[in-house]
Amino acid sequence: MLKKFFLTAIIFCMLTGIAQAADKPQKKSVWQPELRIGILSGVTQVGLKVSAPCIMIDAVTKKTLKKIPAEKNFAVDFAQMKTTAVEIRPEKIPLKDLIATIDGRKYFGGVRVNKVKGSLTVINLVPTEEYLRGVVGEEMSPAYPLEALKAQAVAARSFALKNRERHDKEGFDLCPTTHCQVYEGFEDFEIVNKAVDETRGEVLTFKEKIADTNFHADSGGMTEAVADVWGTNVAYLVPVKELLELTAPWTMKFSAKDFSSRFGDNFGDVKSIKLSTLTIGKSANDRTSSGRVKSAQLVGTKKTLTISGIDLRRKFSLPSTLFDMKLSGDEVIFTGYGRGHGVGMSQQGAKTFAEKNWTYDKILSHYYSGTKLKKLY
């Protein structure tokens, strides 16, 4: 009888324990992709400091080379480095909680230093979510509405993971400039952190693959087809209209002499410019479907040139290719709208939509047609 009582009690305790375990909230996934951001290159020495005790590892053999104390300045010197690459990682805390100072600037995460052709390349080893804390507030103003910042967080996360080996030949994933995404390392904007945290692990996908979510400052009224900028057709990067048109107006003037000199002696002096008038969303032989300049004809005293809008933008450092241009007396005048290449999400447009109470997922679906929002981790 006593045995039966104990057996019953044991079974009851086991079942109760299982039930209680099932009732406990499951711990959120802490895993996230680690990114390699190229910070410095072509240097022979780099000054470093870490916020917590770390170990320096031979990146090839994985052997511990030495321990690094917290908050003590130290340097990695090319001449004294006996291996091709070292990594500095936290001894006890998660990588995301470490702050590394590289040449005076703070970054989330650890550090890798590679020997490359007589100099050092310095790389920030940073978890994706911490990387975004240093990107979102640089690519978009922290003064923008939360839903716009959340859209930016998803776009930046998707772009980073889609293009994470863009600089693989140089030994890292992404650079910290507009070539990839502007990254300033450690930043602590409350609203940016909220935007990142509330979209943790979310990316845009198209046909089960992460989308290449290009974005820009201001479309001027309508975004551009990626095929008209980089020559590749992408189903979700097509022109879409904004709530507002003719935004971010700009004017740039050049003397006719200066203008002509940019095309070489064989061009002579500019006599006339042939380009149809800009209308947002109206295509022409010399304009794309959004109204951006596809090409313009420049008539010189010695030669007539046909030049693309992209080349004109590059040659004269124009804010965008959404412009009119004319020869007026001894001046060439560009009058345009928008800032940036025009592909994908307009950051100013996202702000305007958010101010009209659009949620971040609705903003993203507007700019990236046919994509799906997916929680990757």
Residues covered by each model-derived region:
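Conserved, single-site charged/polar hotspot
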Residues: 2-377
